[in-house]
Amino acid sequence: ELLISYDFHNPITQTNTYFDTENQDVKKQHGAVRIRTIQNKKIFTLKIRKDEYTHYEFEKEISAENINEIEDPEISNWFNQYQIPKNLHPTASFTTLRNVYAFENGELCLDKTYYKNHTDYEIEYEYTSDHDGIHFFNSILEKYGLKWVKNCPSKIARALND
């Protein structure tokens, strides 16, 4: 019902590969290092936990095929600033079919994600600017008898447990 209520355009297929050290140094900081591939475009992402509900997210398009081939000074600065080691290796990978509807301050995302051993569905609201996103997201969900509660593991956690 939610999918047909908004003018979602062509779904996007994206593959996410997450990286960490053998000692899970990134995970210990409640962070994530990811390369997202959409068609031939690769986007590097560093997420660092700000508080219980929010992460800082740094993104930059890259041309490197492998995490260890990235030689971008800005990305190196993020790694140094947040003490992210450079000896990273892939820890999980999955593909998501994402439908996106843009609002003024964020995007409503309906995801169907294919993991190694299962498929799941998720509704997300991703901020594009600072605002009371939780309240706004719940106002959308209310119309369908739903309410957002932090009740499920993240996609990376689900992939690691797959």
For the regions a language model picked out, list residue spans one by one.
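Phosphate-end processing signature that detects enzymes handling 5′-triphosphorylated RNA
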Residues: E1-D162
